[in-house]
Amino acid sequence: MKIPRENLYLRNSSLEQNPGKQKQGNLYKKVLNSLKKIGQVNPLICVKDGDKYKVCVGNNRFLAGCELGFKEFDIVIVPDESIDRFREIMNSYKLVNL
């Protein structure tokens, strides 16, 4: 499902307001370069919050996509109570594949 950028926000609001430290990391740079070359492949994992969607997995993809001017993002909506398990899976995937 594609959602306009303005309907998305990061679960960590301070990261969205001041992403400088996040953008200095190697992972962020890899994600930025990947999005430049091939676009968004993996969806953001989100929880519905009223008429908005909270990005719970995919901070780097979201920030890099915003930096590149993406107007919308592919997302998957999960129940709020499932988000911790999704984050565990995605973090273990990153350790193996990056």
Which ranges hold each PLM region?
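Short, charged/polar connector segments at secondary-structure boundaries
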Residues: 1-78, 86-90
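Positively charged, aromatic-enriched nucleic acid-contacting surfaces
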Residues: 82
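Alpha-helical interaction elements
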Residues: 94-98
